[in-house]
Amino acid sequence: MAKVGKRTRSAREAFVGKDLISVEDAVALIKQAASAKFDETLEVAMNLGVDPRHADQMVRGVVTLPNGTGKTVRVAVFARGAKADEAKAAGADIVGAEDLMETIQSGKIEFDRCIATPDMMPLVGRLGKILGPRNLMPNPKVGTVTMDVKSAVEAAKGGEVQFKVEKAGVIHAGVGKMSFEADKLAQNVRAFVDAVNRAKPAGAKGTYLKKVSLSSTMGPGVSVDLTSATSH
């Protein structure tokens, strides 16, 4: 069994008995315990009372965090002509059509977000088995299939976070860097939780929001009080 370092052990001990605390207290605890040699991300995990195997219980959406994510987002855009030029001017990292499709098919995926104009979807659709499992498939429901390429690229670069419920009814996302001020992280947490609440599907039955946990990339997690996790 691998040895646990003193710093890691003391960080874990600080979390004992600290469940269901306020977002502010949780963020302060996590910031204090963060000990990695890089700027860790504050992770939010939400347990929802849904079964995403049923179409009417799927939860997905997008939210722009008030204080950004602190992450450099690489954006690929499928577009031609004037829309391709618009994407480049807006700051897209990769812009193309058939050439971009071939690059992706070769296994080279050097982007975090994929946007497409509607006319490109027959082409992009061929990449479903590659982009789908990576949650990179453009989708009109989250604004990544659009003619307003400029706004989509700027949103992706400016703190927009997509979310989609997983098989076990869990949603997770990074909502900022541990170097952020504590109040900015708390604001981002509440913006994210509020967005997931707004995305509650019609088919959800019983308790929708069951649990919200926060953690750093390398650290232990702590459950927060649900009333503290939402805006009042």
Curated annotation (Swiss-Prot):
The gene name on file is rplA
Query: What do we know about how this protein assembles, alone or with others?
Result: Part of the 50S ribosomal subunit.
One matching Pfam family is Ribosomal_L1
**NCBIfam families given in the database record:** rplA_bact
Its name, as the record gives it, is: Large ribosomal subunit protein uL1
Keyword rRNA-binding included in the entry's annotation: yes
Q: Which family is this protein grouped under?
A: Belongs to the universal ribosomal protein uL1 family.
MF terms from GO for this chain are: rRNA binding; structural constituent of ribosome; tRNA binding
GO BP term (any one): translation
Keywords for the protein's UniProt record, in alphabetical order: Repressor, Ribonucleoprotein, Ribosomal protein, RNA-binding, rRNA-binding, Translation regulation, tRNA-binding
Q: What does this protein do?
A: Binds directly to 23S rRNA. The L1 stalk is quite mobile in the ribosome, and is involved in E site tRNA release. Protein L1 is also a translational repressor protein, it controls the translation of the L11 operon by binding to its mRNA.
Q: Which organism is it from?
A: Cereibacter sphaeroides (strain ATCC 17023 / DSM 158 / JCM 6121 / CCUG 31486 / LMG 2827 / NBRC 12203 / NCIMB 8253 / ATH 2.4.1.) (Rhodobacter sphaeroides)
Output the Gene Ontology cellular-component terms: cytosolic large ribosomal subunit
